[in-house]
């Protein structure tokens, strides 16, 4: 079904120190075309499993792996790329065997079933792993590399390509501003949706992506990779400003009155973050202010911010959001969690939204917090008055409460003891809260 609401679903929100018990490493999927297809940004180890761990949705609105048509990689660090090959193996299906194998292979489409965009090296990375693991698939894929002026193109000679690989494009940046404009394009519900990209400063080469509509309502989603300075993206993030800016906040200074265990000074935290090419929340807020972002979500969160007990953890996340919000000055910033969904509705009167889409925009389930156990499943949240969130977001949601039915999900029961948490029973899991074992 066509929909006029753009959505972004976070599959992994941890920094490179993850995964943790509650956060997978980086990946998100965006529905920007309105036709049900998804564009993925980054694909950490475990991303495939994140599709399976999503909580039950009564209206089946959860993103599905089969919907992924494009993958955009920001940089070549392991916490952003190690899930690509498992995704490809599942999306493109194994080579058929048996008496009908030849007939089935003859039906293989010559054009690629999935397109991958990324920096120099991504083509060799995927090709090498597929070859070394003797992986053969039923459908094809293609890799387009976004190259800086000093980069060398990776050969697409048939002798070196994987059997399922189609020759991709070598897309060099503009000589003037170093940007990649209109690297991809597809038909959206109001007209073409175009992908632009730009270099951002990290300790290694890194790219930020912008998905933008070329017709009204001119929505724009800016997804930055790891960075301590995304200023080169400014030209792509104005006129119009982003409807949604997703910016990393890998570390933050938390005052001791909020977290008594916080011992690092602000200067030490900032120095280390910059040395590693990462941002603090106020840096994310400052860039959001510069480009006039309408919504700001903090992503790629460090383990120090996510692995506290309930009361402290809530206050820490609230403090991270406060720091970014204060620097932004145009709205309330939100810290992402796994399976959080952000909706960007259309303002077109000719495209009325369904009730489910209205719920997606207007309602929110708080970030999961359990006072008595770990973890908590979605079916528990619906009936629990103790599930709380630091200032629940008005535009961020995992799903509306009405989309989950009591009894559909199951949880694993734990109890605290001196050694941490002891498991009593294990069943199908929902979304876990962000508290690590003691």
Where are these regions (language model features)?
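Conserved active-site loop/cleft motifs that coordinate metal ions or position small ligands
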Residues: 245-247, 296-300, 332-337
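Conserved strand-turn element in the central/C-terminal portion of the radical SAM core barrel
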Residues: 270, 294-307
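Binuclear metal-dependent hydrolase catalytic cores
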Residues: 1-223, 228-235, 255, 303-438
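Conserved acidic residues
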Residues: 69, 243, 294
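A structural motif corresponding to the C-terminal end of an alpha-helix
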Residues: 283-296, 326-331
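Metallo-beta-lactamase
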Residues: 211-276
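Histidine-centered active-site/metal-ligand motif
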Residues: 75-80, 202-203, 247, 275-281, ...
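A short, acidic, amphipathic alpha-helical segment used as a generic capping/interface helix at domain edges
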Residues: 103, 230, 276-290
């Amino acid at each position: 079904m066509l929909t006029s609401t753009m959505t972004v679903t976070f599959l992994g929100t941890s920094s490179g120190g993850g995964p943790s018990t509650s956060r997978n490493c980086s990946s998100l999927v965006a529905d920007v075309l309105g036709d049900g297809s998804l564009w993925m940004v980054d694909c950490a180890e475990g991303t495939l499993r994140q599709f399976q761990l999503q909580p039950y949705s009564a209206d089946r609105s959860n993103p599905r792996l089969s919907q992924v048509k494009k993958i955009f990689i920001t940089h070549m660090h392991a916490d952003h790329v190690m899930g690509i090959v498992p995704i490809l193996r599942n999306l493109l299906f194994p080579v058929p065997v048996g008496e009908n194998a030849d007939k089935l292979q003859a039906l293989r489409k010559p054009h690629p079933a999935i397109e991958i965009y990324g920096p120099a090296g991504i083509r060799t990375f995927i090709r090498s792993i597929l070859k070394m693991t003797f992986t053969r698939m039923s459908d094809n894929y293609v890799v387009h590399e976004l190259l800086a002026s000093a980069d060398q193109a990776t050969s697409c000679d048939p002798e070196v390509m994987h059997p399922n690989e189609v020759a991709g494009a070598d897309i060099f940046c503009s000589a003037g501003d170093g940007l990649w404009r209109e690297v991809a394009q597809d038909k959206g519900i109001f007209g073409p949706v175009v992908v632009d990209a730009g270099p951002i400063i990290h300790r290694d080469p890194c790219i930020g992506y912008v998905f933008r509509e070329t017709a009204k309502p001119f929505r724009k989603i800016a997804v930055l990779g790891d960075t301590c300075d995304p200023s080169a993206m400014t030209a792509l993030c104005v006129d119009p400003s982003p409807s949604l800016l997703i910016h990393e906040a890998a570390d933050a200074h938390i005052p001791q009155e909020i977290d008594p265990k916080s011992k690092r000074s602000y200067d030490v935290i900032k120095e280390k973050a910059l040395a590693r090419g990462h941002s603090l929340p106020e840096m994310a807020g400052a860039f959001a202010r510069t480009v006039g972002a309408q919504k700001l979500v903090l992503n790629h969160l460090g383990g120090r911010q996510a692995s506290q007990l309930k009361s402290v953890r809530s206050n820490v996340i609230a403090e991270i959001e406060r720091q970014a919000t204060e620097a932004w000055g145009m709205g309330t910033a939100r810290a992402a969690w796994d399976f959080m969904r952000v909706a960007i509705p259309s303002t077109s009167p000719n495209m009325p939204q369904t009730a489910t889409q209205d719920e997606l925009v207007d309602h929110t389930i708080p970030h999961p917090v359990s006072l008595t156990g770990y973890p908590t499943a979605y079916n528990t949240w619906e009936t629990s008055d103790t599930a709380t969130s630091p200032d629940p977001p008005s535009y961020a949601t995992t799903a509306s409460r009405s989309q989950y039915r009591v009894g559909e999900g199951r949880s694993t029961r734990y109890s605290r003891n001196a050694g941490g948490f002891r498991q009593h029973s294990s069943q199908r899991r929902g979304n876990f809260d962000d508290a690590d074992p003691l």
